[in-house]
Amino acid sequence: PLQSVPLYSIEGPAVLTPLFAEESKLEPVNYIHIPNLPKCDGAIYVVGDSIYPLVKSGDIILYKQLSDVRDVFWGDMYLLSIDMDGEEYITVKYVQKSEQEGYVRLVSQNQHHADKEIEISRIRAIALIKASVRMHTIG
């Protein structure tokens, strides 16, 4: 059977943490159906260019939520919600093992973005990127 993946709009003040909550009140704006797609929990539009050219702003990424940061596969691409001084920062990055205990290294595909080490405890939500969809024309 063809999987029906909910597509959410998290532009503006919306954040990932409620989207990942078990009883989320966020309504999908649409549904995506792709043959042979691995199991996904949802999809969102990409904003920003940290993973450009692999994924660019406006692309759709499909994700599978992780309940525990320790389940990360080092080197894979993730959608992350990070606590930055009380504000939520949403990003798509490769997650690599850090040399520092209790930290992870966030790596961009885009060479104009520097790698960043963050404390694991600052990660509010994390999801593995399973697929992406790129539109070449709109309309």
Question: Where does each model-flagged region fall?
Answer:
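A residue-level detector for short acidic-glycine micro-motifs
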Residues: 9, 94-97, 131
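Short, positionally conserved secondary-structure boundary motifs
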Residues: 1-57, 67-71, 135-139
